[in-house]
Structures are given as structure tokens and as C-alpha cells.
Amino acid sequence: MGKMTIQQILMQLAGGMGTSIQIFAVTLIFSLPLGLFVALGRMSKNKLLQAVIKVYISIMRGTPLMLQLLVVYFGPYYIFGMRVGNSYRLWAVFIGFVINYAAYFAEIYRSGIQSMPVGQYEAAKLLGYSKSQTFIKIILPQVIKRILPSVTNEVITLVKDTSLAFTLSVMEMFTTAKALASSQVSMMPFVAAGIFYYVFNLVVAMFLEWLEKKLDYR
């Protein structure tokens, strides 16, 4: 590959940027609600369900995300003999990120739910609310306010973690920058990637800070 202009390099990086944003968005959209269901299962009175979810959370939090991505991608072939193509790489990244972050969000939800005073449940019962109504209308809105700072930390980590998709050769921002830096013998792609991650994190942090302040007024 010949020398590329700065404009050509930036155009290449833009494609990787789009994939990074896609990984970020898909992970959040699915892991946040999944994490809530996992948290509820973790607090279930069903001991078997509790134990299974506890093991799942322990594995997700106790092993590297990079290793989990490799297991999700190569697992179908080594365990079931299923052949997976290149198109599965991005899907494997989605699946790996969602199940990993759902475990972290589950623990955040759990700590928030368990911090709520028992008296609120009793007061809601006296007012004729069912358990599900109490949770959705009274408990959950307060939990979201309490856990938002912890969620913000995880979301900021997620922005940087999207670079781990390089493990499966998915052409996100870091993978693209690495390939361009090697072919062009230049640090510029890495500098551009660094600026992207910083600005992306800054925008996410500012949005979540604004959301936190807005919820505090309610």
C-alpha cells in the first residue's frame, strides 16, 4: 500500500469509528435491561436460579473480556463442530460484550435495589400497589438515580473496551488505526484514535452528568 494522504487516513478511520460506536450502542441497549433481569434473578427466592446467576456473574467479572470474546467466537466450533464465518466476528463481539457488561450492571442494580428502605415497600402495599407496581413506579426510579454514578463509570470503561474487538479482527477504531500505522509507518493513526476515544468519553461523561443533574431536580 502506497503513502496515503491525511484525508484518506481519516476516511479509513471513520469506518472504524462507526464500528466502535455500533459496538458501544448495541452493548448498552441490550446489557442495561438484561442486567436488571439478572439482578432480579440474583435476588430471587429460588436458590437454584440464585446459584446459577451467582456463578455467571462471578465468571464474567473474574475472567478477562478478551478471553470471553475468544470463547464466544471459537466456542461453537470447538464445542459443537459448527463452522463460523467472518460475518460471525462482529456478532461474537456483540454477544461477548453484552453478557459481560450485563453482569457488571446486574451487581450495580442489585446494590441499588437492596439499599432502598423496606418501609417504602410496606407503604406501597398499604396504598394498594402490587409488588410489580411498587418496583416499577416507586423503587426503580429511585434506584436509577442512586446507581447513575456507578453506571457512568462502567459506560466510560465500555468506550475504551470497544478496542478489545481487535481480538477477533473486527475493524473498529483501534484495529483500523493499528493496521494504518503499520502500513503507513506513522503514529498519526494512533494519535487520531486516541483523540476519538477521548472526545467520545468526554461527550458520554458530559451527557451522563447532565442526566444525573436533571434527575436530581425531580
Model-predicted regions and their roles:
Residues M1-R218:
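Transmembrane alpha-helices and adjacent helix-loop boundaries
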